[in-house]
């Protein structure tokens, strides 16, 4: 069902498409067919030859199918240019516009003035009829507010400013003086030069600046006042736009001031070139085909035909206006045709024909003219269109130019001053600065006065400078012949740029400080200092060739090689030493415990000597552990148990490894070469990832600081070190020496000098950011080439090498450092003094301990003697008491004995009774007696009567009358034989401390 409906509707859809497209197609055919088939081209020409050539050109055009479509015919309508502009206007209306001209080609006699072409332009422009001028070059025709439909196949005069820029770039002139009239064309050429130079110099290296602008009123009578200002200026290159009459006055007065001779450069426009007193050596411009009316007529006709052909193919062209009186006519096709004309770009008889937005001819060729003797004009160059590059190109044969003063060599273009203002800065070893003493009136022969720059203080002149750069300056001034005033940097800085926002400016402007700022602002002529060449500075000042090539390096304090008293401890870290000490005592304790609690630790052989070695105690265990560690002989106090001996073997192995490692590491540590630096260079990971205990810095605002800003890969490092940057290099170097700063990043020349002067400092790693030190000069300075050539000669002659040895490397100091570094790394007393001191400390400790022991022993002996004396006195006192008791007992026994003799008891019975009373058990054998001082004889006398017999026998009792037993006398003798001393009695104690005096 759906398919059937679609088949039924399809014819209706096709019909609708046809009905819609048909009107459009018809309109297109109408557009092409409704365009006029005939086109009238008007001509307002200056002479009959031009009129005839105009007619002939249009006739030939009709046969050129490249420019004329089929069924299109061109016709010419010409009138003669009248000197009266009002008549010209009426002629244009009556003879051209009434004939429906689509465009007008106009020319005039240049001597008759420019008002006639302006009249044609005003009249035609009112009706939007395009006008193509072939001779009018005044700047006024570029104003589209007035000449709304005017084009020209010749460039305006002020376009010669473009050629001036090309010539200045070719001759490398950087400062110029512009002389121009105060009329429209004069001001237009100045504006064109200033505007074009802003974009032109973005593509070239040499930038020309306008030092002075001299504007004069036309129809001069005298130019003397302006010449006075020009003579005081530095530039000697004059760009002049003036009429032929005014140029005669200027050249006349300039010749009187000797400003047209040697050393001066004049580049003038076409009008001035035709002055009858143009000096020899003047360079001027002359437009190619400037007076070829026929060529310009042909080019204008073909440009017009090309535009109409393209317009016919794209849109409908309405008929041109027919009546000047019809003010209501607004011919839009004329405006569109004017836009098509401006977009043309063809190759014609006068060269490449194209137009800018103002309808002015571009790509016009010029001849560079050199004025010779007798006003002869010689072509020495061309400024023409290069079809390969699609742009204009300057070609000048310098060898054919004769400059003012009949010179073949190109002038410098500026007045070269022979007395210069020089600036420097204190930077060792390149510039040393000292203040003069109160009694000094002049500097030393190798010094030069260097007051502070622009300082009115009287003390500012009391400085003298010497050093590498000062010696270079002295030799440089002799070589290229100049005098100078030397001054110090006012703020002590090389200078860096600050971005400032000028009033009314949309972009930030760089403003330089320090030495660079003085040079940029032209307050100084030259900088003689260790000034690093870098892109930021080279954009604003000029540099000579480097007088010293260098780079950036790192300064650090050399790792200490001095031997301390504990050098022998350095092979092991403090932690390891502590662990070893702890291990000794832990092992000793474990050995003691193993030997103490082992069941075999106190085992003795049954038949062993009673003096066999005792078991291991704690003191012996410590002694054993230390003895094994120190590899000393162990004669006693060894472990007895198996478990303790196993641990002892393990400890011996541990001690062997520790001692061997210590010995090897000691040899490597004290004898082998140690690294000279802590850092390996700029790529050291510790710098790239800066740690808290590692500080690095440079000088803020310096060339090194700019280098780190440029390098993206160093951005992280720069952010870290930026806060640590110093104001001067001197402060940073002092902090490196003191250990406050670990790494100072600066120019290699300065750091190598510091390292050669102080053996404690060393540069780390390879150079990076290689550059050089150069002499700084103003942009366009005439001294640049001379200074560069002189420096190159100094390099070739060896003078720069001599300065390096004299000021930077300090040969004798460096040699001493090398001797220090190359000393054989053998062990000496300073390396091992700590060991000897340790032995001395051990000896002193032993002597001290023995003294303490002796003193302590003497104290103990004295105390023991006092105790012995007291004990002896107490024993004597007790003995005396006991003797008295014994005497009493003896007397009692004697009395009893005597009584017994007289009684019925037998003597034997009495003796037995006495013995029983004294000895409850007579069979008990008395133990061994101890003798104490002074009682040996008493003991024998006392015990002799009571000596016991052999076991199993009765005691042997001696009678009083027995020999050897004297009969005691009453009151005089005590019977000592019957009573023992009290200390042999049961319960006796020897404590006599209470008797000690």
From Swiss-Prot:
<keyword id="KW-0597">Phosphoprotein</keyword>
<keyword id="KW-0106">Calcium</keyword>
<dbReference type="Pfam" id="PF10613">
    <property type="entry name" value="Lig_chan-Glu_bd"/>
</dbReference>
<dbReference type="InterPro" id="IPR049872">
    <property type="entry name" value="NMDA1-like_ligand-bd"/>
</dbReference>
<dbReference type="GO" id="GO:0042331">
    <property type="term" value="P:phototaxis"/>
</dbReference>
<dbReference type="GO" id="GO:0004970">
    <property type="term" value="F:glutamate-gated receptor activity"/>
</dbReference>
<feature type="transmembrane region" description="Helical">
    <location>
        <begin position="574"/>
        <end position="594"/>
    </location>
</feature>
<dbReference type="InterPro" id="IPR001828">
    <property type="entry name" value="ANF_lig-bd_rcpt"/>
</dbReference>
<protein>
    <recommendedName>
        <fullName>Glutamate [NMDA] receptor subunit 1</fullName>
    </recommendedName>
</protein>
<dbReference type="Pfam" id="PF00060">
    <property type="entry name" value="Lig_chan"/>
</dbReference>
<dbReference type="GO" id="GO:0007616">
    <property type="term" value="P:long-term memory"/>
</dbReference>
<dbReference type="GO" id="GO:0014069">
    <property type="term" value="C:postsynaptic density"/>
</dbReference>
<dbReference type="InterPro" id="IPR018882">
    <property type="entry name" value="CaM-bd_C0_NMDA_rcpt_NR1"/>
</dbReference>
<keyword id="KW-1003">Cell membrane</keyword>
<keyword id="KW-0406">Ion transport</keyword>
<dbReference type="GO" id="GO:0045211">
    <property type="term" value="C:postsynaptic membrane"/>
</dbReference>
<feature type="binding site">
    <location>
        <position position="537"/>
    </location>
    <ligand>
        <name>glycine</name>
    </ligand>
</feature>
<keyword id="KW-0770">Synapse</keyword>
<dbReference type="InterPro" id="IPR015683">
    <property type="entry name" value="Ionotropic_Glu_rcpt"/>
</dbReference>
<feature type="glycosylation site" description="N-linked (GlcNAc...) asparagine">
    <location>
        <position position="397"/>
    </location>
</feature>
<keyword id="KW-0628">Postsynaptic cell membrane</keyword>
<keyword id="KW-1071">Ligand-gated ion channel</keyword>
<feature type="compositionally biased region" description="Polar residues">
    <location>
        <begin position="987"/>
        <end position="997"/>
    </location>
</feature>
<feature type="binding site">
    <location>
        <position position="747"/>
    </location>
    <ligand>
        <name>glycine</name>
    </ligand>
</feature>
<dbReference type="GO" id="GO:0004972">
    <property type="term" value="F:NMDA glutamate receptor activity"/>
</dbReference>
<dbReference type="InterPro" id="IPR028082">
    <property type="entry name" value="Peripla_BP_I"/>
</dbReference>
<keyword id="KW-0325">Glycoprotein</keyword>
<feature type="region of interest" description="Disordered">
    <location>
        <begin position="947"/>
        <end position="997"/>
    </location>
</feature>
<dbReference type="GO" id="GO:0017146">
    <property type="term" value="C:NMDA selective glutamate receptor complex"/>
</dbReference>
<dbReference type="GO" id="GO:0008355">
    <property type="term" value="P:olfactory learning"/>
</dbReference>
<dbReference type="Pfam" id="PF10562">
    <property type="entry name" value="CaM_bdg_C0"/>
</dbReference>
<dbReference type="GO" id="GO:0072375">
    <property type="term" value="P:medium-term memory"/>
</dbReference>
<dbReference type="InterPro" id="IPR001320">
    <property type="entry name" value="Iontro_rcpt_C"/>
</dbReference>
<feature type="topological domain" description="Cytoplasmic">
    <location>
        <begin position="853"/>
        <end position="997"/>
    </location>
</feature>
<feature type="binding site">
    <location>
        <position position="703"/>
    </location>
    <ligand>
        <name>glycine</name>
    </ligand>
</feature>
<feature type="transmembrane region" description="Helical">
    <location>
        <begin position="652"/>
        <end position="672"/>
    </location>
</feature>
<comment type="function">
    <text>NMDA receptor subtype of glutamate-gated ion channels with high calcium permeability and voltage-dependent sensitivity to magnesium. Mediated by glycine. This protein plays a key role in synaptic plasticity, synaptogenesis, excitotoxicity, memory acquisition and learning. It mediates neuronal functions in glutamate neurotransmission. Is involved in the cell surface targeting of NMDA receptors. Plays a role in associative learning and in long-term memory consolidation.</text>
</comment>
<dbReference type="GO" id="GO:0050975">
    <property type="term" value="P:sensory perception of touch"/>
</dbReference>
<keyword id="KW-0460">Magnesium</keyword>
<feature type="glycosylation site" description="N-linked (GlcNAc...) asparagine">
    <location>
        <position position="345"/>
    </location>
</feature>
<feature type="topological domain" description="Cytoplasmic">
    <location>
        <begin position="595"/>
        <end position="651"/>
    </location>
</feature>
<feature type="transmembrane region" description="Helical">
    <location>
        <begin position="832"/>
        <end position="852"/>
    </location>
</feature>
């Amino acid at each position: 069902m759906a398919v059937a409906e679609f088949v039924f509707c399809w014819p209706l859809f096709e019909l609708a498409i046809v009905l819609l497209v048909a009107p459009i197609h018809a309109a297109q055919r109408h557009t092409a067919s409704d365009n006029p088939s005939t086109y009238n081209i008007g001509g307002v020409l200056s002479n009959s030859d031009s009129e005839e050539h105009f007619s002939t050109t249009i006739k030939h055009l009709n046969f050129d199918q490249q420019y004329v479509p089929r069924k299109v015919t061109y016709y010419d309508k010409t009138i003669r240019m009248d000197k009266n502009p009002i008549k010209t206007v009426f002629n244009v209306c009556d003879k051209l516009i009434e004939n429906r001209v689509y465009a007008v080609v106009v020319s005039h006699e240049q001597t008759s003035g420019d008002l006639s072409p302006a009249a044609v332009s005003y009249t035609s422009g009112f009706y939007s009829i395009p006008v193509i001028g072939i001779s009018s070059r005044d700047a006024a025709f570029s104003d589209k507010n007035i000449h709304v439909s005017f084009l020209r196949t010749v460039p305006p005069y002020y376009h010669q400013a473009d050629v001036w820029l090309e010539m200045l770039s070719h001759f490398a002139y950087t400062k110029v003086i512009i002389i121009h009239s105060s009329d429209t064309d004069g001001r237009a050429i100045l504006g064109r030069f200033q505007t074009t130079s802003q974009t032109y110099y973005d593509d070239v290296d040499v930038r020309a600046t306008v030092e002075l602008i001299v504007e004069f009123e036309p129809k001069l009578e005298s130019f003397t006042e302006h010449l006075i200002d020009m003579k005081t200026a530095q530039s000697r290159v004059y760009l002049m736009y003036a009429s032929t009459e005014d140029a005669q006055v200027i050249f006349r007065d300039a010749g009187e001031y000797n400003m047209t001779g040697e050393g001066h450069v004049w580049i003038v426009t076409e009008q001035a070139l035709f002055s009858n007193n143009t000096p020899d050596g003047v360079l001027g411009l002359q437009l190619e085909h400037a007076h070829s009316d026929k060529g310009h007529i042909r080019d204008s006709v073909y440009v017009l035909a090309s535009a109409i052909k393209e317009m016919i193919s794209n849109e409908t062209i309405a008929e041109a206006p027919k009546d000047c009186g019809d003010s209501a006519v607004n011919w839009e096709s004329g405006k569109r045709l004017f836009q098509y004309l401006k977009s043309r770009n063809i190759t014609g008889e006068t060269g490449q024909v194209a137009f800018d937005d103002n309808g002015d001819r571009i790509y016009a060729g010029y001849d560079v003219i050199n004025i010779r003797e007798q006003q002869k004009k010689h072509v020495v160059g061309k400024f023409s269109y290069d079809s390969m590059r699609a742009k204009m190109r300057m070609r000048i044969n310098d060898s054919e130019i004769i400059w003012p003063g009949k010179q073949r060599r190109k002038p410098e273009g500026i007045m070269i001053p022979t007395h210069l203002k020089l600036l420097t800065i204190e930077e060792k070893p390149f510039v040393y600065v000292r203040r003069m003493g109160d009694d000094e009136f002049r500097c030393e022969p190798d010094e030069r006065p260097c007051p502070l720059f622009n300082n009115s203080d009287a003390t500012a002149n009391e400085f003298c400078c010497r050093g590498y750069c000062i010696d270079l300056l002295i030799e440089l001034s002799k070589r290229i012949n100049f005098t100078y005033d030397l001054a110090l940097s006012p703020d002590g800085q090389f200078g860096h740029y600050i971005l400032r926002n000028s009033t009314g400016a949309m972009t930030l402007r760089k403003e330089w400080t320090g030495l660079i700022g003085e040079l940029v602002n032209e307050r100084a002529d030259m900088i003689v200092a260790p000034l690093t060449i870098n892109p930021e500075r080279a954009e604003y000042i000029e540099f000579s060739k480097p007088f010293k090539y260098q780079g950036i390096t790192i300064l650090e304090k050399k790792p200490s090689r001095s031997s301390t008293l504990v050098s022998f401890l350095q092979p092991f870290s403090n932690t390891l030493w502590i662990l070893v000490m702890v291990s000794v005592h832990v092992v000793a304790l474990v050995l003691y415990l193993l030997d103490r609690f082992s069941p075999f630790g106190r085992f003795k052989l049954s038949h062993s000597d009673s003096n066999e070695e005792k078991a291991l105690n704690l003191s012996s265990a410590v002694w054993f552990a230390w003895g094994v560690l120190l590899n000393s002989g162990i004669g006693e106090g060894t472990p007895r148990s198996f478990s303790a001996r196993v641990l002892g073997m393990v400890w011996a192995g541990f001690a062997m490894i520790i001692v061997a490692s210590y010995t090897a590491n000691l040899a490597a540590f004290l004898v082998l070469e140690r690294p000279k630096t802590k850092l390996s260079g700029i790529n050291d990971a510790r710098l790239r990832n800066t740690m808290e205990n590692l500080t690095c810095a440079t000088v803020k605002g310096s060339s090194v600081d700019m280098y780190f800003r440029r390098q993206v890969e160093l951005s992280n490092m720069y952010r870290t070190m930026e806060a640590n940057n110093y104001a001067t290099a001197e402060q940073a170097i002092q902090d490196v020496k003191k250990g406050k700063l670990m790494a100072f990043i600066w120019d290699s020349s300065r750091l190598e000098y510091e390292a050669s002067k102080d053996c404690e400092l060393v540069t780390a790693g390879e150079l990076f950011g290689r550059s050089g030190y150069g002499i700084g000069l103003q942009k366009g300075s005439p001294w640049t080439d001379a200074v560069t050539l002189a420096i190159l000669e100094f390099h070739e002659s060896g003078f720069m090498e001599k300065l390096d040895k004299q000021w930077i490397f300090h040969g004798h100091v460096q040699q001493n450092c090398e001797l220090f570094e190359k000393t054989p790394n053998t062990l000496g007393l300073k390396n091992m003094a700590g060991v000897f001191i340790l032995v001395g400390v051990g000896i002193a400790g032993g002597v001290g301990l023995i003294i303490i022991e002796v003193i302590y022993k003497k104290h103990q002996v004295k105390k023991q003697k006092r105790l012995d004396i007291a004990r002896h006195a107490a024993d004597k006192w007790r003995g005396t008491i006991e003797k008295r008791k014994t005497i009493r007992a003896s007397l009692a026994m004697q009395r009893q004995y005597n009584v017994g003799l007289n009684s019925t008891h037998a003597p034997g019975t009495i003796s037995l009774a006495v013995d029983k009373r004294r000895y409850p058990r007579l069979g008990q054998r008395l133990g061994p007696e101890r003798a104490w001082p002074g009682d040996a004889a008493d003991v024998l006398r006392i015990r002799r009567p009571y000596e016991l017999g052999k076991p199993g026998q009765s005691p042997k009792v001696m009678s009083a009358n027995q020999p050897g037993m004297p009969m005691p006398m009453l009151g005089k003798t005590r019977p000592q034989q019957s009573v023992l001393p009290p200390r042999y009695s049961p319960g006796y104690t020897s404590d006599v401390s209470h008797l000690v005096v």
